[in-house]
């Protein structure tokens, strides 16, 4: 998982002194040019959904036409009381894969993220989270662990620069 942003020399952004953690690395040499709290474990926020979407797309391998996912009780009701974003999926509803992807990407839908995690996780959200953490291990991300596919905060849900 690699996120990159290119800025022109004159680009203006938030002052690094007001940022909780950052790391600037020379892409050619791997040399850390500047950092602050780069190994501090912080809430991953939407990086969680990037992993969720990436694993769903990896499993589908671009073949999502005609793929329908069935919404489980847990997809919907595990979010009760979280006041999280959703696309109002209903238990038992069959959702086209493409709609689940778009809903999760565009609306940041946590019910959509749960549905996708079940898809790539062998039928359970827990299996999806296990797949996310297996990918973390494969990528060698020492300071990253996911507790859910949705980005809801938790003590065991963190990443670093």
In which residue ranges do the predicted regions lie?
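Sec-dependent N-terminal signal peptides of Gram-positive bacterial secreted proteins and lipoproteins
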Residues: 1-11
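Active-site-adjacent loops and short helices of periplasmic peptidoglycan-processing enzymes
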Residues: 11-159
């Amino acid at each position: 998982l690699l996120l990159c942003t290119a800025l022109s020399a004159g680009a203006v952004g938030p002052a690094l002194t007001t940022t909780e953690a950052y790391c600037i690395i020379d892409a050619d040499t791997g040399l850390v040019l500047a950092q602050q709290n780069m190994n501090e474990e912080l809430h991953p926020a939407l990086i969680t959904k990037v992993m969720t979407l990436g694993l769903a797309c990896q499993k589908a391998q671009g073949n999502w036409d005609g793929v329908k996912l069935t919404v489980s009780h847990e997809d919907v009701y595990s979010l009760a009381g979280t006041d999280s974003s959703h696309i109002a999926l209903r238990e038992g509803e069959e959702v086209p894969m493409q709609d689940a992807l778009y809903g999760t990407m565009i609306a940041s839908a946590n019910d959509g993220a749960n549905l996708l995690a079940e898809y790539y996780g062998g039928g359970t959200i827990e299996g999806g989270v296990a797949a996310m953490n297996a990918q973390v291990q494969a990528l060698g991300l020492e300071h990253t662990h996911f507790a859910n596919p949705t980005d809801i905060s938790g003590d065991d849900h963190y990443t670093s620069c």
